[in-house]
Amino acid sequence: MIDGDRYVMAPLTASRSVCEAFHPDRSHACIKEYSDDAAYPSYRYDDGLYPLGFYHFHHLFAGHNVERSAWHMRVANVVILLILIGAITVLSQREVRVNIALAALVAWTPMGMYFIASNNPSSWAITGVFCYGAALYAGLKARGWRHWALLGVACLSALLCYESRGDASFYVFVASLGILILEARRRHLPEIGVATVLSAIGVWLMLGSGQASSASQSSDATITVHDRIDVAFTNLRYLPDYFAGFVGLNSGPGWRDTSLPGYAPVVALLVLGFVIFLGARAMSWRKALASIMVFGAMAGIPILVATPTAFPNLGAYHARYTLPLLGVLLLIWVSSAVKKSSLTKGQFTFFVFFLSVVNAVAMHTTIARYVRGLLWIPHIGWIAPVNLNGDIQWWWADMSLSPMTLWGLASLGYTLALTSAIYLLRHRQVEAPVSSTPTEEEEPA
C-alpha cells in the first residue's frame, strides 16, 4: 500500500512500457532507460475487474525478459486465432468459408488484426466472438460429425469470450441470437439448446464481472436524468464517427494516440460500403431481423454505457470494445449473397488492392510510431516518415529483419494470402445447390 492505494512490484520495463503514450513524436526508445532487473510499484494488476483466464494464461509466458515475454504472448494469441479459424474453415462448407473469409477480412483490416496480435484482452474478445458466431453458423449448415465438431469449436470460442472481457461474454448472447434468427430450423433444437446455455453463461458472467460492478458503482447523484439524456443524444450524433473507429478513424493503434493517414480509414470504409451493397443483393426477413438485432446491440450498448460517470461521452468509449460484433454482423449480412454474386475480376482486383493498401499503410504508420516517432507537419498533422530505416531509435532486440524489410514482407504476404484465398475459393468446384423449397423439417423453429 502506498498512500492508501494498492500497488504491486513489477519489472521497471513493464511499469514504464507505455513511456511514449500520448506523445506521437516519441519512439519506444524511452524504454531503454529502464531495466528488467529493477522493480517498481505498479497500479496495473489483477484486481478482479477482468476475468481471470486471459491474464492467468499469459502469466505462463512471463519471464525475466519483458520484451521476449511480450513476443511470446502475442504469438500465442495469433496461434489461437489460426487454430480456431483453421478448424472452422476445414469443417465448414465452401459457401460458408467464403462468407467467413469475407466477413473477417473486412471487419479486421486494419484494427482487428492489430488488436488480435496485441497483449490486450481485446485480442481474445475479437477472436472469440467472431469464431463463436462463425462456428455456430457453419455448424447449423453442416451434417454428421462435422456438425458436432463445429459446435465444439463454438464452445471453445465462447470460453475465450468468457475469459477476456465482461462485455465479450454478453456478446456470446448477441451472436447466438443473430445466428439463430438467421439459420435455425426445427431440426436444429440441439444447436439451439447449446447456444442458449452458452448465452446464459455469458450473460451471468457479464452481470457478475468486475466491469459491470465498476460501472454500477460509479453512479453519481449529481448527474441528473436530464444530463444523461443530453449525453445520450450527443452519443447518438457521434455514433457514425464511433463506427468509423472500427477502421482506425480517430481510434488508431496504441492508446488511440497513433493517427492513421486519412486515406487509410476512407479506403477501408469504401470496402465496407462495397460489402454492405453486396450483402443487400439477397434479403429475407430472417436476415433483416438478425442484422437489425446485432446492429442494435452495436449501437445501443455504447450509447447506454458511455454516460457519466463511467464515461463522459461516447468519445471516451473505445471502438475496440464493440469491434468484436462487426465480424458477426458482416457474416450475417453477406450470407446467401456471395453465391448470388456475379463479381468480375476487375472488382476482385480492386477489393484486393484496397484492402492491401489499408493494411500496408496501417502497418507502416504503426511501425514508424514506435521505431522513430511520427512527424508533425503544420496544417497536415502527424505523418510517418517514408523510410523506416532512416533513424531507427528502437527495434525488437531479437529481430534480424530491419523495420522496412519486415514491413515489406508482411505487406506482400498479406496481399499474396488474400489473392490466393480468393483464387482458391472462386475456382473450387461449386457444391450442388440445395432446393429452395423448404421441407417439413426445415421449417422455422
Predicted regions located by residue number:
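Interfacial juxtamembrane loops and adjacent helix segments
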Residues: 1-67
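Short acidic/glycine- and proline-prone juxtamembrane loop motifs at membrane-interface regions
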Residues: 117-125
